[in-house]
Amino acid sequence: MALLNAGYFTLAAGLVLPALGLAPTTTKYRIDQTLTQEMDATPAGGAKQRIAFSTTSFVTVSLADSGGGKSIRVVVDSVKGDSATPIPAPVLDSARGAEFRGFLDKSGKPTGLTPTAHAGAAVQIQGLLSDFFPWARAGLKVGDTWTDTTAKISGTGSDSVTVRRVSAYKAAANETKESRKAVRVVQDFTSSVQGTQPTPNGPAKIEGTSRGNGSYYVAPDGRYLGGAWQQQSALKISGSFAPQPLPITIVQKTSVSTLK
């Protein structure tokens, strides 16, 4: 039995966009991600399977005033993976120019990021880009705390995963990042995961939980200046191909930086 499409499990927080205020209209970002996935298929007559891979994505993000907030336009400049990446290199290459849209409300809270066209390449990399927008805002002060609850879907139809996440944020310290004053925000989150995915041995049901943490930097005007996160997921996959659910563990790490 094949491993799950690991792109759908890039669940850790990725890129935090600038909140409303004086942030630049257009910003370029680099996103580096690593993922290690292990599955025990012995109950289905298989073997223990492991995959580890990394990807690097470059994107251009544009913000425009819109009713009640700002519209978000994300254009993929490039996505590259190492030799173990489960998404084929031609698919990643064809994602160049793919466009995703989202929205920031007036408080700075982001809503869903979805492809403007359901082309194969855009849909397949949606999992890599699904966590672009954790909460950030201008005027953060040390000691500020807040929580956020989100539900995001990667993929479509019978090949999709829904992640429901509860996050707790705290503005922890004043620091310097990229020669700029910034507030370091720490984030802790828990998630529930449910979905389905076709496999060579029939449809599979996916469910489980994850837990993660990280920190990122926000300038006084709300601009995001980079960050890093890590997450561990404990999932189970079930279907007619196995007499009992098969356990899957996933460890993910994400780092984000701005490009000058």
Give residue spans per PLM region.
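Bacterial N-terminal signal peptides
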Residues: 2-18
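Signature of exported/secreted
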Residues: 17-260
